[in-house]
């Protein structure tokens, strides 16, 4: 025990003497050795998903998907808006390059409805009597066989005339007794006719005439390129008659346009001052009837004069034959 203690006590003295013997040597401090092992730090970036709002469109819908190391973008194939909503559904097919495209959308127009019926054939029993009254007092009365003539286009760029006759049993009457402007409307399957009349109180005698007419008709003529026909004319002065009289004509034709004509057969019309109980006033013949009557009267007069001349000539010859020469 004493020996180790002595060694411990003598240690510093020996070290001090050594320092004095070697003044040029530096002291070295020994540190315990250890090993540093670098630790790899793994950083994992969590993928971030962003959703971009899409807007509903009526055209093609294209969905783009882009994939990267940190960001993934998804465009939903179906988008529904909560306003005036239109829902577009896209069918996406898988691809390998990260882009999916829906097929092109096609817009199909509405299928045309069934064609309107063919024009009605002519019939002798198609004479209709159409009356509109203000209470118990009639103001417009029309009696006629009504037929519509239409010049319609056909295949090949040509045109043809089509004729359709109104059926009185399938025609509804409406109208108005508006002072000096009465009117009459005839509604029938797939069409309508409107007659507008005007009184001329400044003329002597006062008259009433047709000043406006419109027609709208849906009809399927043979090989026709269209079905709907419309025309109107607001500058007419037709079917004119004195107030209190009815306009009478065997065949009155009204031209609404170069392609739409209206024929009124066996016509009798009165649009003002009708007698009670739906009767017509005295008949006023149309110009066509008057133009035929005047040549007939002139012809009969000439024939009568010629007959008188022949009779006078025969009498003169007979008197001359009774005298005998001396």
Curated annotation (Swiss-Prot):
TM spans (from-to): 292-316
Glycosylation sites: 60, 84, 97, 129, 134, 169, 218, 233, 251
One Pfam family recorded for the sequence: Lamp2-like_luminal
Keyword Transmembrane helix in record: yes
Organ and tissue specificity: Expressed in tissue macrophages and to a lesser extent in dendritic cells.
Chain intervals with Pro residues compositional bias: 111-120
Sequence segments annotated as region (Mucin-like): 21-109
Region Disordered, annotated ranges: 38-129
Disulphides: 139-177, 249-286
Function: Could play a role in phagocytic activities of tissue macrophages, both in intracellular lysosomal metabolism and extracellular cell-cell and cell-pathogen interactions. Binds to tissue- and organ-specific lectins or selectins, allowing homing of macrophage subsets to particular sites. Rapid recirculation of CD68 from endosomes and lysosomes to the plasma membrane may allow macrophages to crawl over selectin-bearing substrates or other cells.
PANTHER family per record: LYSOSOME-ASSOCIATED MEMBRANE GLYCOPROTEIN, MACROSIALIN
Name listed for the protein in its UniProt record: Macrosialin
């Amino acid at each position: 025990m004493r020996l180790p203690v002595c060694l411990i006590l003598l240690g510093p003295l020996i070290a001090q003497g050594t320092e004095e013997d070697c003044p040029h040597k530096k002291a070295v401090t020994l540190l315990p050795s250890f090993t540093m092992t670098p630790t790899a730090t793994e950083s994992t970036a969590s993928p971030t998903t962003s959703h971009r709002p899409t807007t509903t469109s009526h055209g093609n819908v294209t969905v783009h998907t882009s994939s990267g190391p940190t960001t993934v973008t998804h465009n939903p194939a179906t988008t529904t808006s909560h306003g005036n909503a239109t829902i577009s559904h896209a069918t996406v097919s898988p691809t390998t390059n990260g882009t999916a495209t829906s097929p092109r959308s096609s817009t199909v127009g509405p299928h045309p409805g069934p064609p309107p019926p063919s024009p009605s054939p002519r019939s002798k029993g198609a004479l209709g009597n159409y009356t509109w009254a203000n209470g118990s007092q009639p103001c417009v009365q029309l009696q006629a066989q009504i037929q519509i003539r239409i010049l319609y286009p056909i295949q090949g760029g040509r045109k043809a005339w089509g004729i359709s006759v109104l059926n009185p049993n399938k025609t509804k009457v409406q109208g108005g007794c508006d002072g000096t402007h009465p009117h009459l409307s005839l509604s029938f399957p797939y069409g309508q006719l409107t007659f507008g009349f005007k009184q001329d109180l400044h003329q002597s005698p006062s008259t009433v005439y047709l000043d406006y007419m419109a027609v709208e008709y849906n009809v399927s003529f043979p090989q026709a390129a269209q079905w709907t026909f419309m025309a109107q004319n607001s500058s007419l002065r037709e079917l004119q008659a004195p107030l209190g009289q009815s306009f009478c004509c065997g065949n009155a034709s009204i031209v609404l346009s170069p392609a739409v004509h209206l024929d009124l057969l066996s016509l009798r019309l009165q649009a003002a001052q009708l007698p009670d109980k739906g009767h017509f006033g005295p008949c006023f013949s149309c110009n066509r009837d008057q133009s035929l009557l005047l040549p007939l009267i002139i012809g009969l007069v000439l024939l009568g004069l010629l007959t008188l001349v022949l009779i006078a000539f025969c009498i003169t010859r007979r008197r001359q034959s009774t005298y005998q020469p001396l």
